[in-house]
Each structure stands twice: as structure tokens, then as C-alpha cells.
Amino acid sequence: MKGKVKKFLVKIGAAVLLIVMIGGVVVSIKEKKESENAIHIVQNGKFNVNPDATFSQAIDQYLIETNWSSYTNNDGRIVQIIGKKRDANVDHTYTYELNYLVDRKNNTYTLYSAYKDGIKMNAVEELILKIKAFDLCDVDIKADEK
């Protein structure tokens, strides 16, 4: 009798473990899709400085080694862009971190935070960077051709 109970408990444990694993995979797939959707909202953003360009075209041409990612915090879904910009005048390469809070219902985003070499930028500094990126963007150049 003890052997049957033990086998039954092992089967129950295996079934519970399988359910937990499947649940984890489903959550992981959902998280990945939400992350990709949020990134696309920001990448497809437009700006009146150059209405033909998308945000990803402008930023990926203006900065080098750009990396787009997404995460969730208490405020919501954040899209993070990290990239570098060489300034020949001071012989320095700056690292920029741009974070945008995404409103998935309205397919919009707003500045969440921005940093230049780890120093917090204000909204005006981020806007200047965005204006320069869009102004210099050539919509006929793909990111891998820059």
C-alpha cells in the first residue's frame, strides 16, 4: 500500500511540476510579445522635424552601437535605448541611455528618463538630441548601411 501511495504522490508531483513549467513558458512568451510590441511603438514613432523618418531610423543613424530593450517597473512598460555618440571636438565617445514610458492603449510613449555618460539629462537636453537625430536622418539609409 505504501508503494502505491508513494507512486501516486510522485505522479501528482510530476503533474504539478509540468503545469508550473507550462505556465512559465506561457508567461515568458507573453512577456516577450509585450516587450516587442512596446519596442515597436517607440521605433515607429514620428517627429515633425523629419516626418518621413521613424524614431528607430533617426536614433540608429545618430547613435552607434544602439541596443533596444524593454522592461516593466512600477510605472509601466519602459523601452530603453542605449547607444554611443562620438564627439570629435572633445575626443570623447558619450554613452546615452534613453528610457521611454509606453502607453500601449494609445500606442504612444513619453520620456521617462535620459542619461549621458550616467549623468541625468533633462527633458530639454533629450529634446535637443532627438531634434538633431531626426534632422540628420536620411530615410534612404538603412541602419546597417551607416
Task: Please tell me what each predicted stretch does.
Residues 11-25:
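Hydrophobic membrane-insertion alpha-helices, especially the h-region
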Residues 5-9, 24-146:
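Cystatin/cathelin-like cysteine-protease inhibitor module
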Residues 1-2:
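N-terminal hydrophobic targeting signals that begin at the initiator methionine
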